[in-house]
Amino acid sequence: VDIQWGNHDVVWMGAAAGSTACIANVIRIAAKYGNLNILEDGYGINLVLLAKLAMECYADDPCTGFTVDYRQGDYDERDALLDEKIHKAIAIIQFKLEGHIIKLHPEFDMDDRLLLDKMDNDKGTVMVYGKEYPLRTTCFPTLDPKDPYALTEQEMDVVERLRGAFMNCEKLQRHIRFLYTKGSLYKVYNGNLLY
């Protein structure tokens, strides 16, 4: 068995190692594609605290732009409303966590990815590369305009609980160890570089 790691593999590796930004990314992708059951049923990761935050913060929000992209027959459509709220809640958490990393490491030269502080909820716009664009939604109850990258206390609780769940999930750790043992970013085979 030989595995070349892709973007998703690396994000899962980071999540298993306890990177909160990677954990948020893994959950966001799972929510977007209607695969939260992989986390809950497959790995036993409890998402109740996140679901509670999502339902409290976005109860009346249609979560425009956070729809679940699923295949017919593979997904219980009754889960869509909750999954969309989870998708939005974890996306905002992810943007905040990534913002912390970007600010902590200016050498990454990723300041252009910092957009939460460029949003104007009153006008319903965001400034990107000097041009103003309309927002699809202005419902961001967990964003503090004075410090948009600060996690709320409830978000911090969710993040810490999820971090512990990912780091202490033996099945996930076993799968990630397998990726480390049997995989790499590239392979040289028959004199050819494979990546």
State where each predicted segment sits.
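Feature recognizes metal-dependent phosphohydrolase scaffolds
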Residues: V1-Y195
